A protein has these predicted regions:
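Walker A (P-loop) phosphate-binding loop of P-loop NTPases
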Residues: 15
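Conserved lysine of the Walker
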Residues: 18
Length: 153
């Protein structure tokens, strides 16, 4: 079991200000980890892969989870406060995908601080883009799904 009380997770639906706050904290000198999902989507687009949520949600979740696990493990010795734009469990809940045994074990054995920062839907700032294709109704449903994962973080 790896318990990291200095690892803080920002979670919630898409387009609600998590990344904006993460970037602000980084500018203030805090140590931050950007969201893996957007990096996976960009990599898949560049390589012509199908591991994106609108083509193959399972592959997307597996790629995102593996990246999140690798980042967590690589930073296990970090003693500074670290803010994560989403946690290991976020992608599979947000996409209604059954987690692999590897992911279930990773969630069970890698623990962030119990204080999780949850960002609720915020319609006034919500925007779609090439990587965030959910309409507002889907963004709200995603938030509800993310809430179900909180006990696992």
């Amino acid at each position: 079991m790896i318990e990291k009380p200095n690892f803080f997770v920002f979670t919630g639906g898409p387009g609600v200000g998590k990344t904006t706050l993460i970037r602000h904290l980084q500018a203030e000198g805090e140590f931050v980890v950007e969201e893996s999902a957007r990096a996976v989507i960009r990599e898949q687009a560049t390589s012509g892969g199908t591991g994106v949520p609108w083509l193959d949600a399972k592959a997307f979740c597996d790629l995102t989870a593996r990246r999140d696990i690798a980042i967590f493990d690589a930073m296990a010795g970090e003693t500074r406060r670290v803010f994560f734009d989403r946690g290991i469990a976020d992608s599979y809940r947000a996409n209604d995908v059954e987690p692999s045994a590897e992911l279930v074990e990773a969630i069970r054995t890698r623990r962030y601080n119990r204080r999780v920062f949850v960002f609720p839907p915020w319609r006034e700032i919500y925007e779609t883009d090439n990587e965030r294709r959910q309409d507002w109704a889907e963004a709200e449903r995603t938030f509800d799904k993310i809430l179900s994962v909180l006990p696992e973080i």
